[in-house]
Amino acid sequence: MKQFRGTTILSVRRNGKVVIGGDGQVSMGSTIMKANARKVRRLYNGKVIAGFAGGTADAFTLFERFESKLEKHSGNLTRAAVELAKDWRTDRILRRLEALLTVADSKASLIITGLGDVIEPEQSLMAIGSGGSFAQAAAKALLENTKLSARKIVEKALTIAADICIYTNLNFTIEELDSES
C-alpha cells in the first residue's frame, strides 16, 4: 500500500510570539487525497501548539499521547516531550508510528521524533516535513532581513515552500501563542 506523505510545518518565535503553521495537503503517491487537513492544533487547554508531519492516523495517536503526558506533568512541555519520546522509542506498537511532531509553549519549542529525540532548535525557528527545508530557509532569510512578525514570516515562508514542494499546498492552518522570548 502506498504511504501518505508530505507536508510542511514551520514554527517561528519572535517578538513575544510563537507561531506554528502548516499546510493542508494529504497525498498518497501522486494523488492529493485531501487539501484541507488540519495538521496544527492547540493542546493542553490552548497553552501548547503542535504540528505534525507524517501519517495522519499516527499523528493523532501521538497528539493524544502527548496531551496525556502534558496532563501528567502539569503542562511541563520538555518533560512531557521526553516522556513521549521514551514511550515512542520503546513501545512495540508506538515504535511503528511514522510521524514527527513540533510542539511549543510560551517558553520552549521542540521537535519530537520516533527515534527518541527531543530537539530544541538553536535559532528561533524549526521546520519538518517534505517542504520543511524550503520553509526553514525562507523563514531564516526573513528573520535576518526583515522586521516582519512571527505570523507573517510563517505565512510567507509556507507560501514559498508551497511554490516549490509538490506535497505542500496553500491551505494553511496557523496557531499563535504569546511567548516569553
Curated annotation (Swiss-Prot):
The keyword Metal-binding applies. Na(+) binds at A162, C165, T168. Its main location: cytoplasm. It is found in: Cytoplasm. One of its GO terms (molecular function) is metal ion binding. SUPFAM superfamilies: N-terminal nucleophile aminohydrolases (Ntn hydrolases) (SSF56235). Its EC number is 3.4.25.2. Pfam families: Proteasome (PF00227). It comes from the Bacteria. InterPro entries: ATP-dep_Prtase_HsIV_su, Ntn_hydrolases_N, Proteasome_sua/b, Proteasome_suB-type. One of its GO terms (biological process) is proteolysis involved in protein catabolic process. Allosterically activated by HslU binding. The active site is at T7. CDD domains: protease_HslV (cd01913). The keyword Magnesium does not apply. Keywords: Allosteric enzyme, Cytoplasm, Hydrolase, Metal-binding, Protease, Sodium, Threonine protease. It catalyses: ATP-dependent cleavage of peptide bonds with broad specificity. GO terms for cellular component: HslUV protease complex; proteasome core complex. Protease subunit of a proteasome-like degradation complex believed to be a general protein degrading machinery. A double ring-shaped homohexamer of HslV is capped on each side by a ring-shaped HslU homohexamer. The assembly of the HslU/HslV complex is dependent on binding of ATP. Belongs to the peptidase T1B family. HslV subfamily. This is ATP-dependent protease subunit HslV. The lineage of its organism: Bacteria, Pseudomonadati, Pseudomonadota, Gammaproteobacteria, Legionellales.
